[in-house]
């Protein structure tokens, strides 16, 4: 699913990675900066997709970035030098990216579980039948299938909208004081007792509000590179979060929670 969705976005904004070691990832994605004496890795406004669960150490390195602790973080990694054994290297990581990783495994560290939205595809009978039908259509005639997909007008309009959002260069999305109060009231009403992880969960809800605002930026109050979310964005975020909040609270993907 992520690999298909990422095709809606400009190619230059998507980074797809299979397995790689933590050091290899930074070397491959980054560029050496002589002045700063380290590798500069610019992940800002990128979509980073790991096609399998990333190396544990790589996720550990990325945790401050995933938590939005700082726009730029410095990481020190060790690497084998040709003559002098192990050598420390500086990595300057610039965010923020949107990060997706796929795994069929059930063991996810709580550190990652609270930083990510845990999602799973629908697996009811009708959905599986549709998937089988699409698989047959695709494999029977790949060229015609891709041509039909490219010619889908709704898909084309969505891709154009995404490109237009990129070209708008929005740098900040605000929520009014009144709407922020409503957001807090809604969130606290949904939890019986607050936990430390809820500090990250409310961040996810706010992120959803901002996503809906960005998708409709032409119809939102705008001042320069800043837009303001409205009540419709908050309502849509509520509706989406309600569907997954209970499973997220238990660190479970919806599929497992609904068994």
Residue ranges and their predicted role:
Residues 1-131, 137-148:
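Conserved ASCE/P-loop NTPase catalytic core
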Residues 90-97, 104-259:
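Phosphate-sensing "switch" segment of ASCE/P-loop ATPases
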